[in-house]
Amino acid sequence: DGVGILTQVPHRYFAKACKALGIELPGEREYGVGMFFFPQGELQRRQAMKMFEVIVQKEGLGFLGWREVPVAANVLGSKARACMPAIWQGFVQKPAGVAPGLAFDRRLYVVRRVFEQSSPASYVCSLSSRTIVYKGMFLVGQLRTFFDDLRAPEYESALAIVHSRFSTNTEPSWQRAHPNRLIAHNGEINTIRGNVNKMLAREETMHTEAFGGDLARVLPVVNSEGSDSAMLDNALEFLMMSGMELPLAVTVTLPEPWAHNDTLSRQRRDFYQYYATMMEPWDGPAALLFSDGDVLGAALDRNGLRPARYCVTDDGRLILASETGVLELDERRILRKGRLHPGKMLLADLTKGELLDDDAVRERYAAQCPYGEWLDQNLLRLRDVKVPNQKVPALPRAESARLQRAFGYTYEEYRDSVLAMALNGAAPIGALREKIVTSTAVYVGKNGDLLEQNAENCRVLKIDHPILSDLDLLKIKAMNRPGFRVVCVSILHYKGTPLKTALEHLFVEVDKAYRNGANVLILSDRGVDESRVAIPSLLAVSAVHQHLVKTKKCTALSLILESGEPREVHHFATLLGYGACAVNPYLAHACIAELTEDGLLEKDYYAAVQDYD
């Protein structure tokens, strides 16, 4: 489905190749090189090339010239050749007042983002002063045959990331071959839709001086038409260009298991806790290779669901691959070998000539700021919140029966869901692994600014479990703390009102709460009677969530649902998946109280609710 290679920019080779074309390149890292996939039609290609030149000039950089990349199209299959783009390289001069490395690459990043929005039919494989990507829709053995450049003796690089793609979630294409601009990824990001929605919403709260006044021009951060790997690459690239070191960006997006891992230092757990309040994990099986040209790293997902083995040789080589034996090696030359463990990272700093293990990398980042002090000052835990009257009035049986009819409870659901779940409390599959790796904690309140490290970012409410008891919800409603404003919005409407009209009215109430400073929104269907019915809870949650995403308020408001409707596992899974941070199933809990009173559960109410939740 595709193969590619990411290397450092081979200055000696390009200086020679460009000189033959009449292009005089400046010194190493004094220019950037872009690898372009242009439309096949000559007119479209020329228009796109001219557009790029104009954008480069407008951004205050100098355009040096174009080079058509020599390729052997005859090695391609018929399908790959039919959709093969025109492959060109463009060279851009670094301005005198711009530092080499990241500062120059940031200027090139702005150029690329503006160009992508102006010429959507073109694709930029890479545009950097430090790295370049050669890739295409062919097999591994055809890579060096197809690209003549890769066979040149002058093509030199201290690193190479090679990837062969097998499509899982998207169709094969030239653009979707790996490596992307920073990463090569074996696996899939299962949480991608939620991650992308959160990044979209986060754009409203992110601020950085790195781009000056150019931040709006590089948005949206993520191209939602890309593959899951490409979207992860988009996010990492944006974080890096905003000033976050690439290994730190990888650590934040793919954290190791930390919440229940007592072997980690307190400082390290505080670091992860701080970032967990702002960034959800990009989760799924993943072996990740990444490089910005100065560092080369590898990371494994926290479940360790993809293989990654490495060895270090006595001549200074680090070889890491999904299998051993990808290169023929004399065993006597191997100084060290091993495999990446779940959630761990290996990093080579090419500028310093250092090979850093996971602890060296993570502990350095954990020590950058007083994360523990910030959390002690600002993170509020629901279990620590007290209310004067902690007794919640029980729901009368007659009222419970009426509400069960209103919300469509059946005898089978009552018996097979509510009773069975409260009675059995099934243990998770692989309980030991899940206890270490997974976390049910959710964070409620306004999201902090991911790009600015400060104490206020972690001023949120931490809830250990997303299924709330009536007492938990009472605590949240009664919460009167600086930085928190809780507003309850009814999702009831009068009978006969079209659902569309009811939703529009709900959006008005949500926007009103936002303008009044709310950062915790409780959607409630309490009060159902003869004249008022509830908007279906999943519809209400998903509609409000999408409304907040579209209006870029999603990170400013957390949604909690107070509803009598959810009672099955699937109900809770979909509600949480479609936008609710937490759910209070007050009617299901009332049913458990009745079952306990009737002696159908041989445990007390609180134990039964815990098993049910």
Predicted regions and their residues:
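Conserved short alpha-helical segments that host acidic/polar catalytic motifs at enzyme active sites
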Residues: 1-448, 454, 469, 477
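Non-catalytic terminal/interface segments that mediate subunit docking, oligomerization
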Residues: 151-155, 178, 412, 423-552
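Secondary-structure transition/capping motifs at alpha-helix termini
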Residues: 153-155, 241-246, 511-521, 545-558, ...
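Acidic, glycine-rich active-site loops and adjacent beta-strand->loop/helix elements
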Residues: 165, 324-326, 527, 563-567, ...
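Short beta-alpha connecting loops at secondary-structure transitions
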Residues: 213-222, 327-333, 556-561, 590-612
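Conserved short loop/turn motifs at secondary-structure junctions
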Residues: 255-256, 524-533, 558-566
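Active-site or pore-adjacent capping/gating segments
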Residues: 342-344, 348-350, 576-613
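Catalytic cores of alpha/beta
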Residues: 565-579
